[in-house]
A protein has these predicted regions:
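A short glycine/serine-rich beta->alpha loop
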Residues: 54, 58-63, 102-110, 156-163
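Functionally critical mobile loop/hinge segments
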Residues: 116-232
Length: 232
């Protein structure tokens, strides 16, 4: 079992295991499940993601027709994707244990920031990175999201949440590429995670999903709220 990213790295080095294998083994131990059951469970989650993607138009392209459909060209196998999902899950589990993954607890840094770190770690795995690369990718992604407030307009998870998700996704790709280029995080990932916890604790409640501050209290947000009230 592990309680930090460094724990995972140490296990990988001591037992000659891959990052994803350590996470899968922990899942098996926690749920008293055999390897096949753990794998099937993760495969089902991946399938659910692919099924959700089917609602989008696969032929959709940019106005010029030069952009779109590039994800399909990467050609990763289901096995590679599931390995990456285990990696992402491992990072997420550590963040959840040592900090938070809820905006109501730690601000949006705990939601989109955590998701971005998880995605960056998974992307590094897909690119064949080492366990150390994975750790740096997660650290670099999360550092860029520290201090992000959770200030949804009208308390709805729409504005500015949807746009911030895009920023988190791009941040994850960038962080993974930086890590794969050999750039390291000056602050270890576990310390970055703890920093997120401390920042979240220092945040006022108005910036923790209460719609009591930030963008949720702008004049335009007030007008949007009035419009909703008229519809009730």
């Amino acid at each position: 079992m592990y309680h930090s990213i460094q724990d995972i790295i140490d296990i990988c080095n001591e037992e000659n295991m891959e990052f994803w294998e350590v996470v899968q083994r922990a899942d098996m131990d926690e749920r008293a499940a055999p390897s096949a059951e753990s794998w099937t469970n993760m495969a089902n989650i991946y399938q659910a993601m692919k099924d959700a993607d089917k609602s989008y138009n696969a032929r959709l392209r940019s106005a010029s027709g030069l952009a779109g459909g590039d994800g399909e060209k990467l050609g990763f196998t289901d096995e590679q994707m599931i390995h990456a999902m285990y990696v992402s899950a491992g990072v997420g589990a550590v963040i959840a244990e040592n900090a938070s993954i809820a905006g109501a607890s730690g601000g949006c840094q705990a939601e989109i920031g955590s998701a971005s770190a998880m995605a960056a770690a998974g992307l590094v795995s897909l690119q064949g990175g080492t366990v150390e690369n994975i750790a740096h990718g997660a650290a670099l992604a999360l550092k860029n999201m520290l201090g992000l407030a959770c200030d949804p307009v009208c308390g709805l998870v729409e504005v500015p949440c949807v746009k911030r998700n895009v920023a988190g996704a791009v941040n994850a790709v960038t962080a993974s590429q930086i890590a794969m280029a050999g750039i390291v995080s000056a602050i270890p990932v576990d310390e970055v995670i703890d920093t997120m916890r401390r920042i979240g604790n220092a945040m006022p409640e108005s910036l923790k999903e209460t719609a009591g501050g930030g963008l949720a209290t702008t004049p335009t947000a007030a007008l949007i709220a009035q419009r909703f009230q008229k519809c009730e």
